[in-house]
């Protein structure tokens, strides 16, 4: 009897794992070609607002690659992940630097790539549990295998959070500057990129001195990367 239960348990576990793998691969393949009008983080924010009793309206409008400002594409890469065209989802150089700084006494800083952030924002939730990190790694591998780099950045720019209830570049451009996503200047794009580490607390339209300095640094990095020509490497 015990062996039968063990055999059934192992069989169930095997089928559950195969089902998860199949479903996750299918989801990633679907989102390779289908516009993304929602994400797990958006759903999480709606649930949070319902629990807190503070309603929030989600603003998000999908824009295809050619309707997204090159300035914004480059600013986000310059700010978040300068090795984005080269790595395969994980930047081990940045991970090592973050660990070295931590061992030296600094606070542990993030080293997530744009690919990792896309996986987390689209498919997962925002806590820092090991379960979530493991699933993030799995989905990162899948999107790196099944999507071109251009698609990863396109989805990221359309779903990333830029303020309370504001998701995606089009909504952020309208919210902060009153322009469409394809009309963002280098200065505006750099400010949007500068607030990404803490978008619900920082503002691109009313920047602190820190955000001003960070956006200036991002613009310098954009020039050093080679401007829009850098995007041809994607």
Curated annotation (Swiss-Prot):
Peptidoglycan polymerase that catalyzes glycan chain elongation from lipid-linked precursors. It comes from Chromohalobacter salexigens (strain ATCC BAA-138 / DSM 3043 / CIP 106854 / NCIMB 13768 / 1H11). Signal peptide: none annotated. It comes from the Bacteria. It catalyses: [GlcNAc-(1->4)-Mur2Ac(oyl-L-Ala-gamma-D-Glu-L-Lys-D-Ala-D-Ala)](n)-di-trans,octa-cis-undecaprenyl diphosphate + beta-D-GlcNAc-(1->4)-Mur2Ac(oyl-L-Ala-gamma-D-Glu-L-Lys-D-Ala-D-Ala)-di-trans,octa-cis-undecaprenyl diphosphate = [GlcNAc-(1->4)-Mur2Ac(oyl-L-Ala-gamma-D-Glu-L-Lys-D-Ala-D-Ala)](n+1)-di-trans,octa-cis-undecaprenyl diphosphate + di-trans,octa-cis-undecaprenyl diphosphate + H(+). It is found in: Cell inner membrane. GO terms for biological process: cell wall organization; peptidoglycan biosynthetic process; regulation of cell shape. InterPro entries: Glyco_trans_51 (IPR001264), Lysozyme-like_dom_sf (IPR023346), PBP_transglycosylase (IPR036950), Pep_trsgly (IPR011812). Keywords: Cell inner membrane, Cell membrane, Cell shape, Cell wall biogenesis/degradation, Glycosyltransferase, Membrane, Peptidoglycan synthesis, Transferase, Transmembrane, Transmembrane helix. Its main location: membrane. This is Biosynthetic peptidoglycan transglycosylase. GO terms for molecular function: pentosyltransferase activity; peptidoglycan glycosyltransferase activity. It is a single-pass membrane protein. The keyword Cell inner membrane applies. The keyword Membrane applies. It is an enzyme of class 2 (transferase). Belongs to the glycosyltransferase 51 family. PANTHER family: BIOSYNTHETIC PEPTIDOGLYCAN TRANSGLYCOSYLASE, MONOFUNCTIONAL BIOSYNTHETIC PEPTIDOGLYCAN TRANSGLYCOSYLASE. Pathway: Cell wall biogenesis; peptidoglycan biosynthesis. SUPFAM superfamilies: Lysozyme-like. It holds the Pfam family Transgly. The chain crosses the membrane at residues 11-31. Its EC number is 2.4.99.28.
